[in-house]
């Protein structure tokens, strides 16, 4: 039996490991255009160490868990998957693999960020040296009157917020920081005490917290925020990050 898994993120690798346990004799193939798996939940660590430390080559993982990696990015549209299913073969640029079962594990992508030059999103951080990014922020927005804004107060946004603050302070930057989040409180799935603790930490760290506001539009160095209860607020921001969650892949 031959099983092809498309997508080398956490879901795809978990699937391959589960298959290895349940069907150890099956031939297993991973299809992903990258050379390595990137631990996205720890991207904030790249602000203080090399991004290479968060990457594991698929070749090493394949040796460890018994699968073969094919670097390719075939179409996974509804029509392409229907053709592949009927033929029992996944074909496209860089790949031509028959299969008995095909698993598609590429369902989530970061929501797009505003296109202005001083905006960074999760997709950008996957290939960005964090320490160089800190130096860029200091060069372009390192003064006490400048502000760096994190839009999105989920787990990733919060981790990045505090890690970025520490990285800027280590370099002596006086840049102010702000967090913008549309929710009434942070991480609503957690107890109320968690929100209170994080809000207190932000206050102690001099971070401006704008809860109940979402991003309406982004201009040159200025954000237009829309409140949950109505009203519009404008915020000067010399550099901004977008951590507004993930969206599903349309098949």
Report the location of each language-model feature:
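Beta1-alpha1 glycine-rich phosphate/pyrophosphate-binding loop at the start
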Residues: 1-68, 158-190
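Localized chelating/binding microdomains
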Residues: 3-6, 10, 14-18, 23-26, ...
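A short acidic Gly-Thr/Ser loop motif
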Residues: 9, 154, 244-245
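A Rossmann-like FAD-binding core segment of flavoenzymes
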Residues: 25, 69-71, 76, 169-251
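Short acidic/His/Gly/Ser-rich catalytic and metal-binding motifs that mark active-site loops
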Residues: 37-40, 111-114, 250
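Short, surface-exposed alpha-helical segments at coil->helix boundaries
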Residues: 51-56, 131, 192-199
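FAD-binding core/adjacent interface of flavoenzyme oxidoreductases
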Residues: 66-147, 230, 241-243
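Rossmann-like NAD(P)H-binding beta-loop-alpha module
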Residues: 133-177
């Amino acid at each position: 039996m031959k099983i092809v898994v498309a997508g080398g993120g956490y879901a795809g690798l978990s699937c391959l490991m589960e298959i290895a346990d349940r069907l150890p004799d099956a031939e297993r193939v991973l299809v992903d255009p990258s050379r390595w798996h990137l631990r996205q939940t720890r991207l904030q660590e790249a602000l203080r160490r090399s991004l290479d430390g968060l990457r594991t080559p698929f070749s090493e993982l394949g040796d460890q868990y018994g699968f073969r990696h094919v670097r390719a990015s075939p179409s996974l549209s509804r029509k392409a998957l229907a053709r592949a299913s009927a033929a029992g073969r996944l074909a496209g640029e860089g790949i031509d693999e028959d299969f008995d079962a095909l698993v598609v594990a590429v369902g989530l992508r970061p929501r797009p960020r505003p296109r202005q030059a001083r905006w960074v999103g999760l997709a950008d951080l996957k290939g960005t040296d964090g320490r160089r990014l800190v130096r860029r922020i200091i060069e372009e927005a390192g003064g006490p009157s400048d502000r760096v804004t994190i839009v999105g107060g989920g787990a990733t946004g919060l981790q990045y917020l505090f890690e970025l603050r520490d990285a800027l302070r280590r370099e002596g930057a006086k840049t102010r920081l702000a967090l913008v989040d549309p929710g009434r409180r942070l991480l609503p799935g957690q107890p109320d005490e968690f929100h209170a603790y994080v809000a207190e930490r932000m206050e102690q760290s001099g971070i401006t917290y704008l809860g109940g506001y979402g991003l309406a539009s982004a201009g040159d160095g200025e954000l237009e925020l829309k409140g949950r209860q109505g009203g519009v607020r404008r915020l000067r921001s010399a550099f901004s990050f977008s951590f507004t969650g993930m969206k599903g892949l349309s098949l």
